[in-house]
A protein has these predicted regions:
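Signature of extracytoplasmic/envelope-associated structural regions
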Residues: 1-212
Length: 212
């Protein structure tokens, strides 16, 4: 199953809504659970996989005060469930993980996002009603002091697979993430703490990060 769309869509990951910005692709590597048999006779082993689909979306987060970023950090990019919607099609999946997440911004502009993720498990396709009802709210940060910034999270999390029947062993699972931040900041020394706290809250949902 391959699906591409060039219009606004709605994405919901762990309860947070993201509205697409004219760019979305969704490609399923196979439509049913994949099983590979290795060996012969009593040495035969079954390798059971899951449905896997790769999706990418260029998006703008519209929910004011969203803690989507901190969820990605806390869960190493793991998505417990989610749905991808547009004007007439909806995709649901059980689990997935974030490959990478990038947030860009500048003076007098709302931040823009880029998210790439892999969904797996029960992936379904169904007709739905239009769901374009997210209200836009501006971020309440002192962006006039921030010239530009680029914030990204990349994860190496992979789904688990089971090998064997009597004594199953989990294989092909790697967890971890990398965070990077490029920031061009112009602010007087007396206002540094206030501006940095606002920016930290913007990118993480809290102001307890340390940016040096």
């Amino acid at each position: 199953m391959r699906y591409f769309r060039n219009q606004d869509i709605c994405v919901r990951l762990e309860g947070d809504s993201i509205k697409g910005a004219n760019s979305f692709s969704f490609d399923s590597s196979y439509s049913s659970p994949k099983v590979e048999v290795v060996g012969k006779g009593i040495l035969t082993r079954s390798y059971g996989g899951k449905n896997e689909s790769v999706g990418s979306i260029s998006a703008l987060i519209l929910d004011d005060g969203s803690d989507l970023y901190s969820k990605f950090i806390a869960n190493s990019g793991v998505i417990s469930n989610g749905s991808l919607g547009s004007s007439d099609v909806n995709f649901n999946f059980n689990q997935g993980y974030i490959n990478s997440y990038t947030l860009n911004g500048g003076v007098s502009t709302l931040p823009s996002d880029s998210i790439e993720f892999v969904a797996y498990g029960e992936i379904e396709n169904e007709e739905i009603d239009p769901q374009d009802n997210i209200g836009e709210k501006a971020f309440k940060s002192k962006s006039e002091h921030i010239q530009s910034f680029n914030y990204s999270i990349s994860t190496s999390w992979k789904p688990s697979y089971i090998m064997g029947t009597h004594l199953p062993v989990n294989v092909s699972r790697v967890e971890g993430y990398t965070i990077s931040l490029d920031l061009d900041l112009i602010v007087a020394g007396s206002a540094m703490d206030s501006v940095m706290n606002d920016f930290e809250k913007l990118i993480s949902g809290s102001n307890d990060l340390t940016i040096t």
